[in-house]
Curated annotation (Swiss-Prot):
Gene3D superfamilies for the chain: Aldolase class I
Species assigned in the record: Borreliella afzelii (strain PKo)
Assembly, per entry: Homodimer.
Gene Ontology molecular functions: triose-phosphate isomerase activity
BP terms from Gene Ontology: gluconeogenesis; glyceraldehyde-3-phosphate biosynthetic process; glycerol catabolic process; glycolytic process
Record carries keyword Isomerase: yes
Recorded name of the encoding gene: tpiA
Keyword Isomerase: yes
Lineage of the species this protein comes from: Bacteria, Pseudomonadati, Spirochaetota, Spirochaetia, Spirochaetales
Protein family (similarity comment): Belongs to the triosephosphate isomerase family.
Protein's name according to its UniProt entry: Triosephosphate isomerase
Amino acid sequence: MRKTFLAGNWKMHYTSAEASIVAKQIATEVKTLNDDFVIMITPPFTALSKVSECIKGSNILLGAQNMSYMESGARTSEISPSMLLEFGVEYVILGHSECRLYLAETDEIINKKIRAGLKHSFKYLILCVGETLDERDSGKTLDVVLSQVKKGLDCVSESDIKRIILAYEPVWAIGTGKTATKEEAEEVHKAIRLEIMKLYSKSASDNIIIQYGGSVNASNIKELMNEPNIDGALIGGASLKAESFLSIINNVR
């Protein structure tokens, strides 16, 4: 049985002090959690150390928003896998649409990051995929998304796919207030799961966690999670306040 995985992506919000306050509020309220339910938050790099201390021993796990595929060297502004592990990071988001857009990350670069991360002790790497509004309107959604899946997972073995989470995040629904309908989201999630079966095996397909991301909130989370191939959510704006993030959590568990 696949776990339910809710991840809060805080993007470029909060100083260390601000992030610590919100992290403490969330950790304090989530006192008990079933084994099949996972909650993660990804503060900015500068807040990782303090947030790690705040959630230590709690039911909240620590993630990072990106990383370099290089271990060290002349890579100004980047952060390596080992640096993240030093802070207690267990999960890393890779290939987010904002990184693809603003940092010009290609499928090939994202694949290098996936392969680099798999050489380290992260529990899971979250590979994000999704189409733009123009691509959806042109009927290219599945072609684009499945291509991103295949390229992102290039050279990833059957054993390593167990450490990959996929997140479908339609670019047109991120930060816009627009959300894919449950039917639209389920169609893509189902196609992704079938693609994993083609690339790997039925077992890999049955077990891989596929999240939805795109203006998720307390009002729409339940209907999204009722779909058979949606296993969780990658949550942006609604995860920034403890109250709204906790409402989402409580509407699911």
